[in-house]
Amino acid sequence: MYKRQAFLLASSIAFYIFIYTVWLKRRTHHNIVIGGAAGAFPPVIGWSCVTGDISVLPLMLFLIIFVWTPPHFWALAMYKDVEYSKVNIPMLPVVHGRKVAKIQSFIYSLVLCLVSVAPFFIGLTGKVYLFSSLFLNSIFIFYSFKLLNSDKNENDIFASRLFKFSILYLYLIFMFFILDKIFQI
């Protein structure tokens, strides 16, 4: 009955263990970008378990997490770069420097805004979600912009703020998905 879901779950776990942890994590600074797929699978698996199929909505949730992952982890890596360097994990700020990581984080923040408002424009959500998403994304982009323009002394402050807000962002964006379905405005 749940063969597809079991396959998705097993694939996600295998991807995380073998592709991300064994192969990517210590070999490339692209580890977070590619490995982000493993962290983005749970909504697809959960949706499939409840509904029995995979539709556009869980794929949008997948995309939100997938695009959210790089700026979230690069922000952490920017203020923990010494620790990542000591244990030989080639995070983007360690390999290519903070400036490159700041630029990439800002670009991903802009893409995240586009991806996260897309559900409204393709008819999956209503105005509650749209306005909430725009508000949350404006804060995410603000912190990312402040980090992008921070000097050496401010870097850790804004990297930490972006990292912490990104956690709240993901929780709230999904909460507003739910509230939007409840209130359907």
How should each PLM-predicted stretch be described?
Residues 3-50:
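Intramembrane alpha-helical segments
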Residues 11, 15, 37, 63, ...:
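Hydrophobic residues within alpha-helical transmembrane segments
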Residues 24, 80, 117-124, 141-151, ...:
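Transmembrane helix-loop junctions and nearby membrane-interface residues
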Residues 43, 65-69, 109-112, 116-119, ...:
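Helical transmembrane-bundle signal
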